[in-house]
A protein has these predicted regions:
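Primarily a LysM-type cell-wall glycan-binding module
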Residues: 499-535, 547-549, 557-559
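Soluble periplasmic/extracytoplasmic beta-strand elements of cell-envelope proteins
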Residues: 39-43, 51-53, 70, 87-89, ...
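Small-residue-rich helix-loop
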Residues: 51-54, 325, 332-500
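Bacterial N-terminal signal peptides
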Residues: 1-9
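Beta-lactamase-like hydrolase cores
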Residues: 14-59, 131-136
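Conserved serine DD-peptidase/penicillin-binding transpeptidase domain
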Residues: 15-29, 77-366, 449, 483-486
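Residue-level preference for non-acidic, small/hydrophobic
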Residues: 48, 67-74, 144, 176, ...
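Short active-site loop at a secondary-structure junction
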Residues: 53-73
Length: 559
């Protein structure tokens, strides 16, 4: 199938550009695409040339490329230093160490309460309990309430494939999350004739389990199966497992994240000797919440007080999880947070409106845009290649580009975008991938051999082969990185991305952290103390600095 390509105006069609265009079209036409539809656009951010255009205005399903819209809107609407807060609240008095009433765990969406950023899965819970103990609380004479009413729901988008709802990438969206709303089933053989032993990691999953499986001495017929038709239904463990079998692991989403959080927090409390006399209850609707639809839970309730509070890492850290790891839960929660910040309602509809308004304010072309979720998992989403390229162009001209660029996966880099690792694109091209059934996409930016910044978006819907689509993306990315203009026609090239200007002061130097460095080494190099560095970097965690991070360094001799 020959793809139609929008040709450049005659004055721009230098021989080098014509050759590039020919090479790109030949790459597309290497394979037969049947009824598949491509949308592609390559645009020079430095010269303003459109180097390739294949149906760039066609609105296609973008898969995870949609995360580019979500994260851009989050940076503009929330800011890179935005934090999620989790509160422990009560309006009850404390007598002899016992809280005389209900205790509420109130979430505002933090998806990072897990071992992703901390030493253990329940470390955030333990820190909250530290604060309760410091307040002298040794017991709770009331209920434990897990309040997730900050977001109104639904837990899952109706456009997500039903067969995927057990998988980690469709974890339920909630204002309260723990362990990214998944548990791992660990199944070990029992005595012959008895059911296998079942546990979940972490425990207290709040999942109903129907274990009818059997441990056998010989071959398993039928083999062990761990099944669930819908997240709200019991997990069924059926079949047989040999007595000499290794343990079997299966990860599944929890049915209701707030139930999971409530059960897990209660277990953490009781593990520290803080007993709860009442039930564990879940609140998901604002109308049922004693906290109410407030952005700051301490406001609006006479006598209500914050007993403990956890503050998340900055949004900029979370955006790297979204774009580099394509984490859907983080994307969905951030999407809802954008809606909540914009209109006071964290529904999918309000959030989509907020994203669109942000894009329009940036001057991004949004014709054909249809957004149903924040992650791109829904097959009902629609975006054009022109919108993605226009977004990259607008972001690259703005003050938040360093944070946005830092969140994108680098080609040839393990655990980011491992493809194109032996090409000119390696450690140069940065782009978001996207894959759902029949859909493949890659959108981002790469520098040519001349250093020219080329924004691109490649999307295909109805692809008969994901492997072929990814191969085409790789070849095009590598070819763009290898592109060189005829001498004398190279446009003025923008400088390499600098760290955010807002984090610099005239009286301080700056240091970019190298691989393996720690604060002690950096302090010695500049002749300052660690505390002096931390004073001018109030958001830096002294126990976690990473390669590529920028630090302000106070100059010796004062201001």
């Amino acid at each position: 199938m020959l793809l139609g390509v929008a040709l450049l105006a005659a004055p721009l069609r230098a021989q080098d550009v014509e050759q590039l265009q020919t090479d790109l079209v030949e790459t597309f036409n290497t394979y037969s695409w049947g009824d598949a539809r491509w949308g592609a656009l390559v645009y020079s951010l430095d010269s303003g040339d459109t180097l390739l255009a294949i149906a760039p205005d066609s609105a296609l399903a973008p898969a995870s490329n949609l995360k580019l819209l979500t994260t851009a809107a989050a940076l503009h609407r929330l800011g890179p230093d935005y934090r999620f807060h989790t509160y422990v609240l009560s309006d009850a008095p404390v007598r002899n160490g016992v809280l005389q009433g209900d205790l509420t765990l109130y979430g505002t969406g933090d998806p990072g309460i897990s071992d992703r950023f901390y030493g253990r899965k329940d470390e955030v819970f333990q820190r909250l309990i530290d604060d309760l103990e410091a307040a002298g609380i040794t017991g709770i004479d009331g209920d434990l309430i897990a309040d997730a009413s900050f977001f109104p729901g639904p837990l899952r988008d109706a456009g997500w494939e039903r067969r995927d709802l057990n998988e980690h990438f469709t974890a339920g969206i909630s204002a309260l999350s723990y362990n990214e709303n998944v548990v791992s089933f660990r199944i070990r053989p029992g005595q012959v004739g008895a059911p296998p032993r079942v546990e979940t990691v972490p425990p207290h999953s709040a999942l109903e389990v129907d274990n009818t499986a059997e441990t056998v001495s010989g071959r398993a017929r039928p083999r062990l199966a761990i099944l669930r038709d819908d997240p709200v239904e019991p997990v069924r463990i059926t079949g047989q497992i040999p007595s000499n079998s290794r343990e079997v692991w299966r990860q599944m989403t929890v049915a209701v994240p707030a139930d999971f959080v409530g059960a897990s927090f209660r277990a953490a409390l009781e593990g520290r000797g803080i007993t709860v006399s009442g039930a564990t209850r879940t609140v998901e609707l604002p109308i049922e919440s004693s906290v109410g639809r407030l952005s700051a839970p301490a406001l609006g309730r006479p006598g209500a007080r914050i007993l403990a509070r956890h503050t998340s890492r900055p949004l900029s850290d979370y955006l790297e999880v979204v774009n580099k790891e394509s984490n859907n839960l983080f994307a969905e929660v951030i999407f809802r947070a954008v809606g909540r910040a914009d209109s006071g309602v964290g529904s999918p509809e309000a959030s989509a409106d907020a994203v669109r308004r942000t894009l329009v304010a940036l001057g991004v072309e949004t014709t054909g845009l249809r957004q149903h979720d924040g992650s791109g998992l829904s097959s009902e989403n629609r975006v054009s290649a022109a919108t993605f390229v226009d977004l990259i162009r607008r972001m690259s001209d703005g003050p938040l580009w360093p944070e946005y660029w830092a969140s994108l996966p680098r080609a040839g880099t393990r655990r980011e975008l491992g493809r194109m690792y032996r090409t000119a694109a390696a450690d140069n091209l940065r782009a978001k991938t996207g894959t759902i059934d029949g859909v493949s996409a890659l959108s981002g930016m790469v520098r040519s051999r001349d250093g020219e910044r080329l924004a691109f978006s490649l999307m295909v819907n109805g692809s008969p082969s994901q492997t072929r689509a990814k191969r085409v993306e790789n070849q095009i990315g590598a070819r763009l990185a290898d592109f060189r203009r005829t001498p004398g026609t190279v446009p003025v090239i923008a400088e390499e991305t600098a760290p955010p200007a807002s984090r610099t002061t005239a009286s301080n130097d700056r240091h970019r952290v190298n691989r393996g460095e720690n604060l002690s080494e950096i302090a010695r190099r500049y002749g300052v103390t660690i505390n002096e560095i931390l004073q001018v970097n109030p958001r830096v965690d002294r126990n976690r600095i990473v390669a590529g991070q920028w630090l302000e360094i106070p100059r010796q001799g004062g201001n």
